[in-house]
Amino acid sequence: EGLTVGPNIERMGIRAASNCEVIYENVRVPKENLLGKEGQGYKIAMTALGGGRIGIGAQSVGIAQGAIDETLKYVKERKQGGKPIGKYQNTQFKLAECQTKVDAARLMVWRAATEKDNHGNYAPYAAMCKYFASDVANEVTRQCVQLFGGYGYCREYPVERAMRDAKITEIYEGTNEAMKMIISGSMKV
């Protein structure tokens, strides 16, 4: 009683899951149903965000790697000037740069996850991996769309969806600007 779920809100990306407003009006939670101790909700929520940020880092790596994988298939098939566009140095260099950044992001995700598993102060590592990996996902998906040319802008091709899906990773579980505040705070700036 007192709980209302609003209508689904259409989004630019990550459209497989519903997104709706949840409204609480005069909701009472019995003491036996409390998670943690009374007054500790904010602290618990902030702790959970750290693990979520590692998940967003991993999601970002997956989006970027998927875009690269699709682009690799495409550049082997698409021909220009009588040869596959994957044979051109510009294409090779763009893909090499993208893969290098994705692998660096993957290592940052692993580092943050390891720190969390070892019960260390993983908050700055979670912030770094989320910030870096989401930035990489957005850059890599843009490059992949570019390599697809006009096709990359069409819903028929998966890199278009990857580019839309990548954007939210810079926003949820804390914006990348907030991640920079956490990182710089851990540096005692």
State where each predicted segment sits.
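FAD-binding core of flavoproteins
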Residues: E1-K73, Q80-K83, T175-V189
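Generic, well-ordered alpha-helical scaffold segments in large soluble proteins
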Residues: A48, A67-Y74, R111, Q143, ...
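C-terminal helix-coil-helix/basic helical segment that borders enzyme active sites and/or dimer interfaces
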Residues: L72-G86, Q99-F132, V145-F148
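Hydrophobic faces of stable alpha-helices that mediate helix-helix packing
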Residues: V61, Q65-I68, V102-V109, A137, ...
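Alpha-helix capping/hinge segments and adjacent helical runs
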Residues: I14, G120, P124-V189
